Structures are given as C-alpha cells and as structure tokens.
Swiss-Prot record:
Changing Y299F: Abolished activation following binding to cadaverine. One of its GO terms (cellular component) is plasma membrane. Residues 1-35, 92-108, 172-195, 276-288 are extracellular. PANTHER family: G-PROTEIN COUPLED RECEPTORS FAMILY 1 PROFILE DOMAIN-CONTAINING PROTEIN, HISTAMINE RECEPTOR-RELATED G-PROTEIN COUPLED RECEPTOR. Keywords: Cell membrane, Disulfide bond, G-protein coupled receptor, Membrane, Receptor, Transducer, Transmembrane, Transmembrane helix. Disulfide bonds join C24-C186, C107-C186. Residues 57-70, 130-150, 217-254, 310-365 are cytoplasmic. Belongs to the G-protein coupled receptor 1 family. This is Trace amine-associated receptor 365. It is a multi-pass membrane protein. GO terms for biological process: G protein-coupled receptor signaling pathway. It comes from Petromyzon marinus. The gene is TAAR365. InterPro entries: GPCR_Rhodpsn, GPCR_Rhodpsn_7TM, TAAR.
Length: 365
C-alpha cells in the first residue's frame, strides 16, 4: 500500500525545479516582492525573540512581577519565544520561496511544534482569564483558590497538547482520507492539511470553547470591576479611599492588559480557524499564498504580546526600561516598586528612547 509520503513523491502536478533539485509549486513572486517579504519578516522575527526574551527576564528578575498570574504569563512568553526561534524562521523560508528545503520528516516535526505552541498559547490565555476572574470576583480568597498547586495543575493541563499533537502529526493522522489532495502536492512542499475530524476537534477545543470562556470571563470581570469601583467610592473614607483605589487599580491594570491581549489574540487567530474549518468541509481551494498569509497572522500574535505588555501595563513597561537602560547591572533593583520608577537620569535617556520607539508614546495609566 502506498504511504502518504510516497503519494506526495508521486505527485502528478507539474512542479518547478526551484533550487538545487528541489521540486516545488510554481511561485510567481518577483525578486522585488521577495525582497519586500524578507524586509518585513526578518524584523518581525527579531521583535518576537527580543520582546518575549525581555518579558521572560523581567518576570525572573523583578520580585514584584513574580506573582501567580505572571507564572502563567512567563510560560506564555516562553511559548511565544519558541515560536520566534523554532517556527517563524522555517516558515519564513517557506513563505518567501514557496518551497520546503528540510525534508518530509522535519515538515511533520515543524507542524507538530507549530500547533503545540500555538494551542499552548490559547490554553494559557484561558488559564490567565480564570486567574483574573478569581482575583476580581473573589479577592479575599484568591490566595486560597489560586495556589501553587493550582498553577502547576493548569500548566500540566496546558502542556498535554505536546504529546497529543506529536501523535497526530508524526503518525500522520491529520492526513488520513486526504490522499487525493496529497497527490496534487509537489515533492518539496510542506502542506498544512487537516482532515475533517481533526480540523473540527482542533477548532472546537483549541478555539471555540477557550474563546467563549475567555469572552464570558472578561465580560463578567468588567461588570464586577465597575461595581467594585462604585462601592469603594461610596463606602470608603479619607486615606482608605486612596489605599483601596490603589489596590484595585493594580488588579485592574493586570486584568485590562490581559483582556487586551485576549482581544488581539482572537482577532489574529479567528481567520485561521475559520478558513481551516471551511477548507476541511468544502475542500482545499485556498492558494498556498493565502494559507501562508493566514499562518503569519497567527505568528504575529507572538510578536505583539510583549509590545502590549509594555504599552498597557506600567510595571512591565518600567521593567523593560530598567533592563534596557542597564540600571539592573549597576545596583539591585529586584525589589523596586515598578509602579514608581524615575526615568529622569541622563544616562538612561537612550534606553528611554529605545522603549518609546518600540512601544510608541503611551501615557502611564
């Protein structure tokens, strides 16, 4: 019986010899257009790696950022960092040259980690939404409900997608029933094909259910935040007002940041889940160029997350500033109050301009 790999190798589609005996689908992208793609993709990869590395270092270094919420945020940044290191460079070569230079086995490994890391981001965002919901809805029992054990169990649950996608892609379960489509693929292409059962399961459990839960959680959080703000204003007196408002503002700052990140995530990922599901149902009609464009929408989500942290969360913004300015190397800033960091030193103006360039001119909240 012919294997799926042999089916691709015996493709009857007219392919072109692209580079050094690699046979790929014809690509009418001009050299000028290819240069533009490279000029866009390389900075995106660099920002993804640098920004998420900055997030990881910030959480590991500054004590104020070492909260249970940020344990989940740390793993989200690690997942995004791995997307920049392991996924985007190889996908960039495929996008620019419309060819896969690394063999069929590595194509499956690449798809495995691509889906694993992206699904991991979805699940981590869902866990962070639950954490924020508990912090706002039940603040007095937050530390009883969100314990170290709870965080460990949530992380374990999220990482279960690693062996799941490993079995699916390495055993080619996602390609069962797609022999006809595979026969039309060139030998050195790396197709991202999902049969209907896997596409539906991936969409429902990797998109629809988490996004519904996140939307409901943040909708409820918004209602509770407004109620708490009114209650504090009407019941607190004198210095108690400032203290209560300060505590509430810090919780809301983290919640607003994660809410924005979830909103951006849904916007960037929805096209992929819609197209992948409809393609599986009605047949694969979208061009390889369209697929690459949609895939890069999902990768860009890993690029923008650290930018959103810096733009909408003052502690993270100040942490990035202290790292880029080099102040963490001159004296101990591990215990600094990241809500109140002075930016006035002349030595640090270059770093301040660097941060401003990266995140734009955002006013402190």
């Amino acid at each position: 019986m012919e294997t799926l790999n042999e089916s691709i190798r015996n493709s009857s589609l007219l392919c072109v010899e692209a580079f050094h005996n690699f046979h790929c689908t014809y690509n009418d992208v001009s050299e000028a257009e290819r240069a533009i793609l490279i000029a866009i993709i390389i900075p995106a990869i660099a920002i993804t790696i640098f920004g998420n590395l900055l997030t990881v270092v910030s959480i590991l270094y500054f004590r104020q950022l070492q909260t249970r919420t940020n344990v989940l945020t740390l793993f989200l940044a690690v997942a995004d960092l791995l997307v920049g290191l392991l996924i985007m460079p190889f996908s960039a070569m495929r996008s620019v040259y419309n060819c896969w230079f690394y063999g069929w086995t590595f194509c499956k490994i690449h798809s495995w980690f691509d889906y694993t890391l992206c699904t991991l981001s979805v699940l981590l965002l869902s866990c962070i939404s639950f954490d924020r919901y508990v912090a706002i809805s039940d603040p007095l029992r937050y530390h009883q409900r969100i314990t170290n054990r709870t965080c460990a169990l949530m992380l374990l649950f999220c990482w279960l997608c690693l062996p799941f996608y490993g079995l699916v892609f390495m055993l080619e379960w996602n390609l069962v029933g797609l022999e006809e489509e595979l026969a039309q693929i060139c030998p050195d292409d790396c197709p991202v094909l999902l049969n209907l059962p896997f596409a539906m399961a991936n969409t429902i459990f990797g998109c629809v259910v988490p996004m519904i839960l996140m939307t409901l959680a943040y909708g409820r959080i918004y209602q509770l935040a407004r109620q708490q703000a009114r209650k504090i204003t009407s019941t607190a007196m004198g210095s108690n007002v400032d203290s209560a408002r300060s505590s509430l503002r810090r919780e809301h700052s983290a919640t607003i940041t994660m809410g924005i990140i979830v909103g951006v995530f849904i916007s960037l990922w929805m096209p992929y889940f819609v197209v992948s599901t409809t393609e599986s149902i009605f047949g694969y009609q979208a061009s390889s160029l369209a697929w690459e464009f949609i895939n890069w929408f999902t990768y860009i989500n890993s690029t923008v997350n650290p930018i959103l942290f810096a733009a909408f969360n003052r502690p993270f913004r100040n942490a990035f500033y202290l790292i880029l300015s080099g102040r963490i190397f001159s004296s101990s800033y591990r215990g600094v109050d990241l809500f109140n960091v002075q930016h006035g030193s002349k030595v640090n103006q270059g770093a301040k301009r660097c941060v401003s360039t990266l995140i734009g001119k955002e006013s402190d909240r």
